Amino acid sequence: MKDQIIITLGREHGSGGHYIADMIARELGIKLYDKDSIESEIVSEGYSEELIRRMDEKPVNFFASRRIGRFSNSLEVNVAEKTFDMIRAKAASGESFLLIGRCGEQVLKDDPHRVSLFIGGDPHAKLCRVMEKKGLSAEEAIEEIRTVDHQRKAYHNYYCEMKWGDARAYDLTVKSDVLGMEGTAEMLIRYIRAFQEKD
C-alpha cells in the first residue's frame, strides 16, 4: 500500500469539482490545495496578492512575454513556474494532498503516488449550478462558464503538452451529474483507495 497519495483534480466550471474535492480530502484526511491556499503560500514568497489573483489560471499575454531558454520576463510565467516548483517540492516532501487545477496532472505526471482526475458535467446541469450558486441569469451564467473555462484551457494548454480536459491526460474523467456530487465523491474515493492499495 502506498504511504503517500497525491490527487490532482481538473474541473469544468459549474461541475462542482471544488465541492467534490473538499469531500474527498476530508474523507481521506489530507490537505486540499486550491486557489486560496496556493495564493497564500506564493504571497509569502514575496509576490503581491493582487498580482497573484489577477493571474490565477489566466492565459499568458503572449505580446508581453519573451522567453530566453528556460527563463521569461513575463510575470505570469514566473508566477506559474513558482507555483509548479512549490507543487513539486510538496510532492517530494512525502506529503499527501489533493491539488485543484494548476496543471497538476502534468506537473507531477512522473510521480508514482499521483492519481489524476478530471470532473466535467452536462452543460444544463453546470448552467443550473452556476445560476443557483452565483445568483445569475441564464445568460450571465453561460458567459461566466464560457469565460472561466476558456481561461483555464488557455492557461493549461500554454504550459502542458496534453490538452485541458483531454481524457488521455487523466487516469479518470467523470461527469458529476450522473451520480450527483456525493455519489461522484464516494465513487472517486473508492477509486483512490484502490489505487493506494495497488503495488
Protein language model regions, located:
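Pre-Walker A (Motif I) flank of P-loop NTPase domains
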Residues: 2-11, 95
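Glycine-rich phosphate-binding P-loop
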Residues: 8-22
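Short beta-strand-centered segment that lines the nucleotide-binding/catalytic pocket of NTP-utilizing
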Residues: 31-43
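ATP-dependent small-molecule kinase phosphotransfer cores
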Residues: 42-96
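Small-molecule kinase domains that catalyze NTP-dependent phosphoryl transfer to phosphate-bearing small molecules
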Residues: 60-66, 77, 138-182
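Short, amphipathic alpha-helical "lid/cap" segments that border enzyme active or binding sites
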Residues: 84, 181-189
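Short, polar loop motifs at secondary-structure junctions
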Residues: 101-105
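Conserved phosphate-donor/acceptor-positioning beta-strand/loop module used by diverse small-molecule
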Residues: 110-133, 138-146
